[in-house]
Amino acid sequence: MTASLFFSSCAEDGGIYHYILQNGKLTLRSFTPCDRPMYTITEKKQLWVILRDCFDDHTSGLQEYKILDSGTLMPIGEPVSTKGIVACHLCGFHGKIYAANYLSGSIFSSSGALDVHNGHGVHPSRQEAPHTHFIAPSPDRKFLLSTDLGLDSIFVYD
């Protein structure tokens, strides 16, 4: 059995590593340098990555890559701002890519839409503001679910 794996490294001089796992052996196939990749997902023959702090206003970026047959990554366009600070999680849902912006407490859609959470949680020292940290489809793929540590809440989007 052969599996293709992508790992991101946010360290200095980091980037995205492509490995092949075959017969229990892991082999590096390619390396794509990029600025502080935080989280990656693959959707069909595309790879999406959150870039930690790639704009002058310190917002995170969302970069799309085409995965070539060799596993090499080819960038598609330039990074797009997630309109938030410290994006930390991605998911694909109904043809769009969504990013959770941790410090901004918001959800960004690749269509350009932004939903900002408001309020605070019951623990003022830890929950002074929204901290959106996860986004994923519901198990039946009818809804988009988002968790927010700062509000101690789960949001459901349809």
Where are these regions (language model features)?
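Residue-level detector of Asp-centered blade-edge/turn motifs that repeat once per structural unit
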Residues: 1, 42-45, 92-94, 139-140
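Conserved beta-strand positions in repeat-built beta-propeller and related beta-rich domains
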Residues: 7-11, 49-56, 99-103, 138, ...
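Structural motif
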Residues: 13-17, 57-63, 106-108, 153-156
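Loop-centered beta-sheet repeat module
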Residues: 141-158
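Asp-box/WD-like beta-propeller blade repeats and closely related beta-sheet repeat scaffolds
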Residues: 73-134
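Repeated scaffold domains used in trafficking and secretory/extracellular systems
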Residues: 35-41, 85-89
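Short loop/turn segments immediately following beta-strands, especially the blade-tip
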Residues: 19-24, 65-72, 111-113, 158
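An edge-strand/N-cap motif at the start of beta-rich repeat modules
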Residues: 1-21
